[in-house]
């Protein structure tokens, strides 16, 4: 059986997928990755997997505006008459389709942050499993969206806040899509993908799930969450969703390779002794490079959450290139 891994181009997402890919390889299945960056292709091949290079069919509107500015708006305006942008998009899609067809995959593990490509695989008749490499993004009335900064409590006020947080995502996303559609004369990312859905015979209005904290999702899709359920807030077991098992032996007694965690574990044990009922929330942020402004916003948000919830203890693990001075003055419960 040939399995295609179409993973979002970020190191953290790739690393999360390797655990699953290794299991399939051990069962003597063929595993093939597709990559858009040469650096990622090198990492994948170092792990012993096949990899093909595939360009993005379309860059995001924000990225195009960041690089081209007003020139991009002009290109979109002229494309209303020439259809240049639409034709270029569908040429990329045709190339993508030919490359995928040549592989003849029996199943695709598609990163949930690339969910709009589900339509293409639907057209080719290839079953898709969406891989969530971050906390599960499915709507649950008792679990806040990951990006909200809310901590669920068993109260009516908490449930109302959670509901409003989910509705805010839908409203903001629709307003943003409408804004880009008008600004870019319906030559925007979302409008072109909507046309792809129609071309592929994939019902757009019925399948699009607006209630997702990171990016638009696809309803009724099979989902594999690479985060064990124990690392998420308690929630109802979602249909068509499977949690990956924990890949860490919590009872192991091997020497700690990174001694910076020793101090953290000592502090956690001390807190548990002093307050046995204490709740500990673990937060993590992977390596950030070239997103200093965004990193600052995230750190300030985490700091505010800690200050609003003194009854919890927070552990924050960060990757490279983070400026942790944004947390100063550091809350006592962080």
Model regions and ranges:
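Conserved nucleotide-sugar donor-binding subdomain of glycosyltransferases
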Residues: 65-118, 122, 168-215
């Amino acid at each position: 059986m040939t399995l295609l891994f179409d993973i979002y181009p970020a190191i953290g997402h790739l690393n999360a997928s390797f655990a699953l890919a290794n299991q399939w390889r051990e069962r003597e299945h063929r595993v093939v990755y597709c990559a858009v960056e040469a650096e990622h292709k090198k990492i994948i091949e170092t792990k012993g997997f096949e990899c093909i290079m595939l360009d993005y069919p379309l860059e995001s509107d924000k990225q195009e505006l960041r690089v081209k500015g007003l020139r991009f708006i002009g290109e979109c305006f002229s494309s209303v008459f020439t259809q240049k942008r639409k034709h270029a998009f569908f040429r990329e899609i045709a190339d993508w389709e030919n490359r995928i067809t040549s592989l003849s995959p029996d199943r695709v593990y598609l990163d949930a942050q690339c969910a709009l490509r589900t339509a293409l695989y639907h057209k080719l008749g290839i079953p898709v499993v969406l891989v969530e490499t971050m906390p599960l993004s499915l709507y649950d009335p008792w679990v806040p969206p990951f990006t909200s900064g809310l901590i669920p409590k068993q109260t009516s006020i908490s449930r109302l806040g959670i509901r409003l947080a989910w509705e805010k995502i839908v409203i903001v996303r629709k307003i943003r899509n409408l804004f880009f559609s008008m600004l870019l004369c319906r030559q925007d990312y979302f409008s072109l993908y909507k046309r792809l859905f129609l071309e592929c015979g994939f019902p757009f209005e019925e399948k699009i799930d607006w209630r997702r904290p990171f990016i638009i999702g696809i309803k009724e899709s099979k989902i594999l969450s690479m985060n064990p359920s124990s690392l998420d807030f308690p929630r109802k077991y979602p249909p068509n969703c499977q949690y990956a098992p924990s890949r860490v032996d919590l009872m192991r007694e091997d020497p700690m390779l990174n001694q910076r965690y020793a101090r953290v574990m000592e502090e956690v044990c001390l807190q548990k002794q002093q307050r046995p009922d204490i709740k500990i929330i673990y937060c993590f942020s992977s390596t950030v490079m070239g997103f200093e402004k965004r990193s600052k916003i995230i750190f300030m948000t985490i700091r505010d959450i800690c200050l609003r919830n003194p009854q919890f203890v927070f552990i924050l693990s960060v990757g490279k290139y983070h400026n942790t001075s944004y947390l100063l003055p550091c809350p006592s419960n962080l």
